[in-house]
Regions:
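Nucleic-acid substrate recognition interfaces
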Residues: 1-124
Length: 125
């Protein structure tokens, strides 16, 4: 409904809009139930610009050989990948810092491996 009225909303990834609504809902729930302060935009002195998008049908991919990240509504983006990972990608948060650079933080689900119990104690002074 809003996308018909505001055409520019079609340019934005739908999960970015959905996550924004979830964040706003959580802020109002805390305000009414946990007696937190009234939710307000913190953009007066905060230059933190970011959004989070979720994965669906493989719309977020990382190519370690070509150093590229595929994000929804964007082409393949050239990236400096600092470490490799294995597991299923859950979401990606894209941030712009005040210098104008962009950073992508990728949330990955991996299997939890428990360490074996050794029955030895270690003391640290």
């Amino acid at each position: 409904k809003l996308k018909k009225e505001y055409e520019w909303l079609k340019e934005v990834d739908k999960f970015a809009l959905t996550n924004t609504i979830y964040n706003m809902d959580a802020a109002y729930r805390k305000f009414f139930k946990e007696h937190a302060g009234y939710p307000k935009f913190k953009s007066k002195h905060d230059n933190h610009k970011s959004y989070t998008t979720n994965i669906t049908n493989g719309n977020i991919t990382v190519d370690f050989k070509c150093n590229r990240v595929k994000l929804p509504k964007l082409k393949d983006v050239k990236a400096k990948l600092h470490r490799s990972f294995s597991g299923q990608i859950k979401s990606a948060t894209i941030s712009q810092v005040p210098s104008g650079k962009y950073y992508v933080s990728i949330l990955v689900e991996t299997e939890h491996m428990e360490l074996p119990h050794t029955n030895q104690n270690t003391g640290i002074d």
